[in-house]
A protein has these predicted regions:
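Short amphipathic alpha-helical segments
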Residues: 123-125, 147-148, 167-168, 186-190, ...
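Conserved SAM/SAH-binding loop
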Residues: 157-162, 182
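Segments forming oxygen-rich coordination pockets for charged ligands
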Residues: 1-138, 142, 146-155, 169-173, ...
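Short, well-ordered alpha-helical microsegments
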Residues: 119-120, 184-185, 210
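ADP-ribose/adenylate-binding Rossmann-like module
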Residues: 136, 173, 178-181, 189-216
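Short amphipathic alpha-helix with an adjacent loop that forms part of the alpha/beta core around
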Residues: 160-170
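Short beta-strand segments
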Residues: 31-33, 113, 137, 177-178, ...
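Adenosine-phosphate binding glycine-rich loop
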Residues: 204-282
Length: 282
């Protein structure tokens, strides 16, 4: 659906982006950066024209209905996947329009269940990585703003119903690091019984405890696909020992899940020495 109205100014577009992000709604902005006319054709789109696009509607115009239609398709494609800022050429009978498509998404949510020694450095790392961090714990002396100054929210929660009042959606990353395996498991069961699938669910624990938890989930009839997706034991294998090291291993896995990649050292994937330096010396 295209909402009525004429061209958008840059200020109006910025306002719509800010409004969407504050409301937790993804959107994309499309901006004309160049118009190349075909022969004697008149200029259809002018550099600086803006279009605002959501999943179900759009506002503004680039100057031509067919041009708008194609721009909306590009914007929604960027929103539906991990699309990043990109320029595209849209060909029309009158010429070629070069547009800049920029997806705008609310920051992903990182919910840390447990406010202990791993949670503190993980909260700091999560905020640094651009997550909106919420920390939950049932102990009032642990669930404090002083312990987690980087968190957007610090909540005292009942581990019998840990996510009450906490929205969980497809852009939520959940890390279960409570003071006891029993609480981790109960929170995990709560999450996996929900119809919505979070972007990431990870649980701390030894190999033995992880196996026991996953076997229990299978006995409870939880979808095997959901069980297999649980990151447990949590984090990348960097032989982490200290709370800070464990937090960094978890944070690295969050980035891997969010951005994609192999998790291997870049030295091994790029092989700069073998491909160029050593070859040049032979």
């Amino acid at each position: 659906m295209t909402e009525p109205g004429g061209p958008l100014s840059a200020a109006e577009t910025v306002h719509l982006v800010r409004q969407a992000l504050e409301g937790g709604e993804p959107m994309a902005s499309v901006t004309v950066i160049e118009w190349r006319a075909s022969g004697e054709s008149s200029q259809v789109a002018r550099a600086g024209a803006h279009l605002a696009v959501w999943s179900d509607r759009s506002r503004g115009t680039l100057g031509d209905a067919r041009l708008d239609e194609r721009a909306v398709e590009l914007a929604r494609a960027a929103l539906s996947g991990p699309g990043r800022v990109a320029s595209h050429e849209i060909e029309t009978e009158a010429g070629v329009c070069v547009v800049y498509v920029e997806p705008h998404r609310p920051p992903p949510e990182l919910v840390i269940v447990g406010a202990g020694h791993i949670a503190r450095p993980l909260c700091a790392a999560g905020a640094l990585l651009g997550f909106r961090v919420t920390v939950l714990d049932d102990r009032p002396e642990f669930a404090t703003r002083e312990r987690f100054p980087e968190a957007a929210e610090v909540r005292r929660a009942d581990f019998a119903d840990p996510f009450r009042g906490v929205p969980i959606g497809p852009q939520t990353y959940l890390v279960l690091v409570t003071r006891g395996h029993k609480y981790d498991f109960e929170a995990l069961m709560d999450v996996l019984r929900r119809p919505v699938r979070p972007a990431y669910v990870g649980m701390v624990g030894s190999r033995r405890r992880t196996r026991a938890a996953l076997e229990q989930l299978a006995r409870e009839g939880v979808d095997p696909e959901r069980i297999a997706a649980v990151r447990a034991p949590i984090g990348l294998d960097v032989r982490a020992e200290t709370p800070g090291e464990i937090a960094i291993a978890i944070a690295a896995e969050l980035v891997l899940e969010r951005r994609g990649g192999t998790g291997r050292p870049l030295r091994d994937t790029e092989r700069v020495y073998e491909r160029w330096v050593r070859r040049a010396g032979e």
